């Protein structure tokens, strides 16, 4: 298969908070170990919205015109001279963080902790709201024809849940509570189901998201506008508490609730990042009950497992994509995801449609 690569491409460039313009940029040149990818689908993530509205996340500050988007999949358009894993026309999912491979974290297999990672759409590295991106072949993964590009793009948020399951050693038959049903939380439900959790309890404010969680595999849903999460969890678990809790929303109250829901000797994973640096937690409860607490930062070694889970049909993510936009409509897509969270789940942009 051949693919004619143009010299220039369209890109959705953020010039200021809530201001995106469509520009023409050169198609990137690839190094010997890289592939050029024609981007077919990009999901909008919470971090994209944070940069879009605030221009920064913590120490990562947007200081120049910037391209968002990191949940992506596409088609190989060109390969470098030493690339031996791919050919033009291959359909691929993209793991968006390129690491050094030399530091202590990389050598230990925890490359998500690499201090020199170059992560798409994390300043100063531009993202995937463009028609073409380049990527080192190590971070590109073949997808079967049975997977759509949208599903392949969702492997990125799915990976966060897979990583949380691996870190907390989630066992078949376990009871788990997952707080927050944003896109990461919904994909965390999928991960819990794929790992064989027996009881999956989820909490959120929005009926749309709770119903989506049911479709993803949740066995119990709790609308915290109407119900007391802890009381409901006590009832469901016969006062035992859950084996594992994941907080995915970055909400301080939800984190405290997640901790309180865990049984003696249980586990808590902090998946969502709160806006504040310090949150009060019940330290005597943690110590007296020997609660293990896990930080979750992105993921490592998850993409093959994510592709396997989706291709097997264990979980079905097709219903999560509620809104679709062209590259020229990227600002509209961002505003939709920002302002109508009660109406949409995952908003997808198609740079080459």
Swiss-Prot record:
SUPFAM superfamilies: GroES-like, NAD(P)-binding Rossmann-fold domains. NAD(+) binds at residues 184, 204, 209, 271-273, 296-298. One of its GO terms (molecular function) is D-xylulose reductase activity. Its cofactor is Zn(2+). Binds 1 Zn(2+) ion per subunit. The keyword Oxidoreductase applies. Its EC number is 1.1.1.-, 1.1.1.14, 1.1.1.9. Substrate binds at residues 51, 156, 298-299. Belongs to the zinc-containing alcohol dehydrogenase family. Homotetramer. This is Sorbitol dehydrogenase. It comes from Bacillus subtilis (strain 168).
């Amino acid at each position: 298969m051949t693919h004619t690569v143009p010299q220039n491409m369209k890109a959705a460039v953020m010039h200021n908070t809530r201001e995106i313009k469509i520009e023409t940029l050169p198609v990137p040149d690839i190094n010997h170990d890289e592939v050029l990818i024609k981007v077919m689908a990009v999901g909008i993530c919470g971090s994209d919205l944070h940069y879009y509205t605030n221009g920064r996340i913590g120490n990562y500050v947007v200081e120049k015109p910037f391209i968002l988007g990191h949940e992506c999949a596409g088609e190989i358009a060109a390969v470098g001279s030493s690339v031996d894993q791919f050919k033009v026309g291959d359909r691929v999912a993209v793991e968006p963080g390129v690491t050094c491979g030399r530091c202590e974290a990389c050598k230990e297999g925890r490359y998500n902790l690499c201090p020199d990672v170059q992560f798409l759409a994390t300043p100063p590295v531009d993202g995937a709201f463009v028609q073409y991106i380049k990527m080192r072949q190590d971070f590109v993964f073949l997808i079967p024809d049975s997977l759509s590009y949208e599903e392949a793009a969702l492997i990125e948020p799915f990976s966060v849940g897979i990583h949380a399951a691996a870190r907390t050693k989630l066992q078949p038959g376990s009871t788990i509570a997952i707080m927050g049903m944003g896109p990461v939380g919904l994909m965390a439900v999928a991960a819990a189901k794929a790992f064989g959790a027996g009881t999956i309890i989820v909490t959120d404010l929005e009926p749309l998201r709770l119903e989506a969680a049911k479709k993803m595999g949740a066995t119990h849903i709790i609308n915290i506008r109407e119900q007391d999460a802890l009381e409901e969890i006590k009832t469901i678990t016969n006062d035992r508490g859950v084996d594992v809790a994941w907080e995915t929303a970055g909400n301080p109250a939800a984190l405290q609730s997640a901790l309180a829901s865990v049984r003696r000797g249980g586990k808590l994973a902090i998946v969502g990042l709160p806006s504040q640096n310090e949150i009060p937690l019940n330290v005597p409860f943690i110590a007296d009950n020997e609660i293990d607490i896990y930080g979750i930062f992105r993921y490592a070694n998850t993409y093959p497992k994510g592709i396997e889970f989706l291709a097997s049909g264990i979980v079905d993510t097709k219903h999560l994509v509620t809104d679709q936009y062209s590259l020229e409509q990227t600002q509209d897509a961002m505003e939709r995801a920002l302002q109508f969270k009660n109406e949409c789940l995952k908003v997808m942009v198609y740079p080459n449609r």
